[in-house]
Regions:
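Acyl-donor (CoA/ACP) binding surface of acyl/acetyltransferases
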Residues: 1-28, 32-36, 71, 75-185
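Conserved GNAT-fold acetyl-CoA-binding loop/helix
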Residues: 37-59
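Generic hydrophobic, helix-prone segments enriched in Leu/Val/Ile
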Residues: 5-8, 47, 64-65
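A generic alpha-helix structural signal
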Residues: 30, 54-57, 61, 122
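A short helix-loop-beta-strand connector motif used in the catalytic cores of GNAT acetyltransferases and
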Residues: 60-73
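Hydrophobic residues in alpha-helical segments
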Residues: 33, 42, 64-65
Length: 185
């Protein structure tokens, strides 16, 4: 049974506050989602307008409202502005399973912030969303994301051939999983 509340949960770590993203955050979302390097493996073209950022925020809100997932804005405690996001989507409640996604402004790469945020949401997902399995689908050339999930205990299960059609082409994706039993052990 899902113990998550109707209110959007705010999570705190040593350096971060993970919170709901609102339309007030559109400029910050646009700033990093318009960066080609950030969007390289995101499945979308770099954003060209603020309306695309507002559409992304609307998608985040629909995940939570429809109980299909949740997406947190990643903020530094002392700043408050959104520097990335992370969360769950494609939640399948009857199978206690979801997919994880994350991205971070390039300015903050290599500082351990994504790992800190993802550790917090995994703990939340296992405890309050009663997840048993979290999947990560990652393009083979995206080595930094592969290393990150491997450090967090995810296991690569295989290659999903031509699994996604994005940016006018089919992409292979590695499928990784983290089970609640992996975390407990």
């Amino acid at each position: 049974m899902d113990k998550a509340t109707e209110l959007f949960p705010v999570l705190e770590t040593e350096r971060l506050v993970l919170r709901e993203v609102t339309n007030k955050d559109a400029q910050q979302i646009f700033d990093y989602l318009s960066d080609e390097e950030v969007m390289k493996y995101y499945g979308l073209e770099p954003f060209k307008t603020i309306d695309e950022a507002l559409d992304e925020i609307s998608w985040y809100q629909s995940l939570f409202n429809q109980k299909k997932g949740i997406r947190w804005g990643i903020t530094l405690k002392e700043q408050g502005e959104v520097i990335g996001s992370c969360g769950f989507h494609n939640k399948v409640s009857q199978h206690y399973r979801t997919e994880i996604g994350f991205e971070l402004s390039r300015k903050y790469w290599g500082q351990g912030l994504a790992r800190e945020a993802i550790e917090a949401i995994i703990q939340y997902g296992m405890e309050y969303m009663t997840l048993h399995r979290i999947e990560a689908l990652i393009e083979p050339p995206n080595l930094p994301s592969q290393r990150l999930v491997e450090k967090l205990g995810f296991t690569r299960e295989g290659l999903l051939r031509d699994y996604e059609f994005t940016k006018g082409k089919f992409d292979n994706l590695f499928i990784y999983s983290l089970l609640k039993t992996d975390v407990e052990n």
